[in-house]
C-alpha cells in the first residue's frame, strides 16, 4: 500500500515528472491527500522564520493538482481528501479516512467524522499536516494509525535529528518516527 501525504508539486509543469518519479509505485494500491504545495506553488522562505511561529500565506499561484489527481485515480489510487474508504489490500481489510490540508484550514472533519468500521483489520487516518486539532478527532473516533507529512522531520534540526521547529501544532519531539 502506498500512502501519499501531499506536497508533490512545485511547478506548473511538474505533473509528468511527479508521475515518472512515482513510477512503479503507481502500480500498487494507493491513497492520497493533498498538501498546500499541490494546490499552490511554493515560495522561497528563510527557514529560520519558522522560529517566529507565524504561519505564512501560500503563494496562490495555482498548480495543476486536478491533472495529478486524475492520474492518481486512473492508476487506481483513492482520493482521501474529505473522504472515507473501505477496501482490502491482500487479506487486510482497511478503513481509511482523510482530510484536506489542515495547515491552511482546508479540512472539514465533519465530512468524515465517526468511528471506522469495526470489521476493519486496520484503520488509517490521513492528513498532510499533523495538526493536533485534527489528530485528536481521529483518535477520539478510534483510528489506530495516522499518517501525515509536512514536517520534513523538522524544518530546522540540530545534529541528532533534534528539531527546532515543526511548522505545525505538534511538539518538536514528534516530527518524525512512530509515536503512541
Regions found by a protein language model. Give the residues of each.
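Beta-strand-turn-beta hairpins that frame and shape the catalytic cleft
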Residues: 77-78, 84-96, 118-122, 180
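Active-site-proximal loop/helix segment associated with metal-binding centers of metalloenzymes
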Residues: 101-106, 110-118
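Conserved acidic residues
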Residues: 2, 28, 121-123, 144
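Short, conserved loop/helix-junction motifs that constitute active-site signature segments
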Residues: 22-27, 116-119, 138-142
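Conserved beta-sheet core of the metallophosphoesterase superfamily
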Residues: 130-180
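Glycine-enriched alpha-helix->loop->beta-strand junction motifs that scaffold or abut catalytic
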Residues: 76, 93, 142-146
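Core catalytic region of metal-dependent phosphoesterases/phosphodiesterases
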Residues: 1-88
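Active-site-proximal beta-strand elements of phosphoester/diester hydrolases
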Residues: 1, 93-102, 124-128
Amino acid at each position: 500500500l502506498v500512502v501519499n501525504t501531499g506536497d508533490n508539486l512545485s511547478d506548473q509543469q511538474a505533473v509528468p515528472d511527479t508521475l515518472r518519479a512515482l513510477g512503479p509505485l503507481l502500480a500498487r494500491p494507493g491513497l492520497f491527500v493533498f498538501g498546500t504545495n499541490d494546490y499552490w506553488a511554493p515560495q522561497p522562505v528563510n527557514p529560520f522564520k519558522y522560529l517566529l511561529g507565524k504561519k505564512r500565506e501560500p503563494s496562490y499561484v495555482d498548480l495543476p493538482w486536478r491533472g495529478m489527481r486524475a492520474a492518481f485515480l486512473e492508476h487506481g489510487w483513492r482520493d482521501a481528501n474529505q473522504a472515507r474508504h473501505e477496501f482490502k489490500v491482500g487479506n487486510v481489510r482497511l478503513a481509511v479516512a482523510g482530510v484536506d490540508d489542515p495547515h491552511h484550514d482546508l479540512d472539514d472533519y465533519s465530512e468524515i467524522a465517526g468511528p471506522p468500521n469495526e470489521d476493519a483489520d486496520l484503520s488509517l487516518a490521513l492528513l498532510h499536516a499533523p495538526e493536533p486539532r485534527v489528530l485528536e478527532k481521529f483518535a477520539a473516533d478510534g483510528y489506530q494509525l495516522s499518517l501525515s507529512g509536512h514536517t520534513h522531520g523538522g524544518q530546522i534540526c540540530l545534529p541528532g535529528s533534534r528539531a527546532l521547529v515543526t511548522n505545525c501544532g505538534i511538539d518538536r519531539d514528534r516530527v518524525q518516527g512512530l509515536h503512541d
